[in-house]
Each structure stands twice: as C-alpha cells, then as structure tokens.
Amino acid sequence: RGLGDVYKRQRDFMIDKGFTYCIPPFMIRSDVVTGVMSFDEMDAMMYKIEGEDLYLIGTSEHSMIGKFKDQIVKEEELPITMTSYSPCFRKEVGAHGIEERGIYRVHQFEKQEMVVLCKPEEAMEWYDKMWSYTVELFRSLDIPVRTLECCSGDLADLKVKSCDVEAWSPRPVSYTHLTLPTN
C-alpha cells in the first residue's frame, strides 16, 4: 500500500489505455539525447558520467525514444505507445526558485512517462489524448488538478505545444506544477 500502490496504479492505468510498459536504461548516450533536445538543454539539465559518453537520464522519455534511433518505423506499425516509471536525475534543482514552477525540484525523483510515436498528422490528437490521460489519472487518485497552456515563449527547443498540469497542494495552499504534456 502507500506509495507502492500509487506507482502500481499509475502503471496499470497506462497499460489499460493501451500503452506498452518499458523499463528504460538509466544512462543514455549524448547522440540519443541530442535527437530530442538541444545540447544547451542537455548541458543545463543532465549529469554527465565522467570519462564516458553517458548521461544519467533526466526523463525516461529520452530512453524510450532512443530505442528507435537510426531505425525506420513502418507507417503500419504506428502509433507506438510506451510508458515507463523510472528514477530521473537533474542538475536544475532550485534553478527556478521555490515558488516558481513547483517546490519539488530536487536532484533525483521518480515519475511515470508516456511516449507516442505516430504519424505527424496524428500528433495533435495524441497530444490531446496524453493530456486527457494525465488529468484522468490524477483525478482517479483524488488529486484536484488544473491545466494551463504554455505560451510559445515558454516552450523548450523542438516543442510545438505544451501545458502545465498542476495539483492542489495544502502547502503552499495553491496549485503546484506536476507535469508537462508536450508535443
């Protein structure tokens, strides 16, 4: 019970939505990461393993997407839907201040991820589904949530659309950033 039950419920929720559960590697090569984010973002966020071309993952999305590096996925195989639960490691702890973008910026944390590889013309439809699944999951855990669409100036490199999903928190008695579905 407790947190273990919450983790299991998250995983099972995504599997019930048709996602394939993956156990990602916790270290990733730079050529895989730079396929999904800019070098500047990688340098600011990720811990490099000294003497190796490896980084601790900042999110398991990169590992899941990296599985398809240098491959041609046939159109009839799409969409490919994947989910994982993993530890994440980030250098950006406290980088945004305690009240900005949530109070939970720490060096190591765990999170559930979902990734969809789809046809470009289906990308916005899948973005909407992923946002909907995110909200549905938190509400199924009796966590009050709201969403705020991000303006284009707040989007990271290589991103088209994103929204903050925030949860009600008794401390600091306001909504706090939880996750950021992105296309």
Predicted features and spans:
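Generic beta-strand/beta-sheet core signal
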Residues: P25, I57-T59, T83-S86, Q112-L117, ...
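Conserved small/polar residues in nucleotide/adenosyl-binding loops
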Residues: G2-Q10, T176-T182
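Active-site loop/lid in soluble adenylation, ligation, and acyl-transfer enzymes
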Residues: R1, K8-H96
